[in-house]
Regions:
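Conserved beta-hairpin
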Residues: 48-69, 82-84
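Conserved acetyl-CoA-binding loop-helix of GNAT-fold acetyltransferases
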Residues: 118-133
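Extended hydrophobic secondary-structure segments that form protein cores and membrane-embedded regions
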Residues: 52-57, 68, 106-107, 144-150
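Short amphipathic alpha-helix that is part of the acyltransferase structural core
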Residues: 2-47, 54
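Conserved acyl-donor/pantetheine-binding loop and adjacent beta-alpha core of acyl/acetyltransferases
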Residues: 67-109, 175-177
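C-terminal "cap" of GNAT-fold acetyltransferases
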Residues: 149-152, 172-205
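A short, internal acetyl-CoA/4′-phosphopantetheine-binding micro-motif in the GNAT/acyltransferase core
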Residues: 108-118
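Conserved active-site alpha-helix within GNAT-family acetyltransferase domains
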Residues: 138, 149-170
Length: 205
């Protein structure tokens, strides 16, 4: 499955209560994500905190292939430790070192229909998101795609496979940036890890 095949098989739409009424219940295998996409997405939309989109099969419009929620975000340089700050400044080149934050978009939630797992849809959807925000359609600058990924091997592997890397190279530094007491039991491992994709790596059409 690649991006071209995804767009030929699916429609891309904003998620609304009407759309969900027309579809089978969406399940990606993570209860918290499924619950969010059933109801909480609307609160986020009403409060202007995030917009949720879906791909539906053209030949079976009742089946949602994938859903994701997007919000504005930024990578804030002052929150990074020295080695991670140097990495961001390296990829953004010398002329931009004085910026305190770099604009990005946050994938707040993303799920693929569990009946369609391991068929390449997840990678194709990520290719769509990165291409979408790298295109000239958008009215503001967006340098990075950011995600707060569930800290489990499958999820981390998915994002790494799709070109993401950790914002904090060491998990302990990420915990400190969150104000967590790393000496307390069960602080580590973190439930989620911040990761980013640098959109400058892909060219404009």
């Amino acid at each position: 499955m690649n991006l071209e095949e995804l767009l030929s098989e699916c429609t891309f739409e904003r998620v609304t209560p009407t759309l969900l009424e027309q579809c089978e219940p969406f399940a990606c295998g993570h209860d918290d994500l499924d619950e969010f996409f059933r109801s909480d997405y609307k609160l986020y939309a009403d409060k202007l905190l995030g917009k949720t989109y879906a791909f539906r099969l053209i030949n079976n419009p009742s089946k949602i292939v994938s859903i994701f929620t997007l919000s504005n975000d930024a990578i804030r340089i002052k929150q990074l430790v020295a080695e991670d700050k140097e990495q961001i400044e390296y990829v953004t080149e010398n002329g931009e070192k004085n910026l305190r934050r770099f604009p990005g978009v946050l994938i707040g939630r993303l799920g693929t229909n569990q009946t369609l797992s391991r068929k390449g849809y997840g990678t194709a959807v990520m290719d769509f998101i990165t291409a979408w925000f790298r295109s000239n359609e958008h009215k503001t600058g967006c340098r990075f795609i950011i995600v707060d990924a569930h800290n489990n091997p499958d999820t981390i592997r998915y994002y790494e496979k799709n070109g993401f890397q950790f914002l904090y190279s060491e998990e302990i530094n990420e915990a400190k940036s969150m104000g967590l007491n790393i000496k307390r039991p069960n602080t580590l491992p973190l439930n989620t890890r911040l990761m980013y994709f640098d959109l400058i790596k892909i060219g404009l059409d």
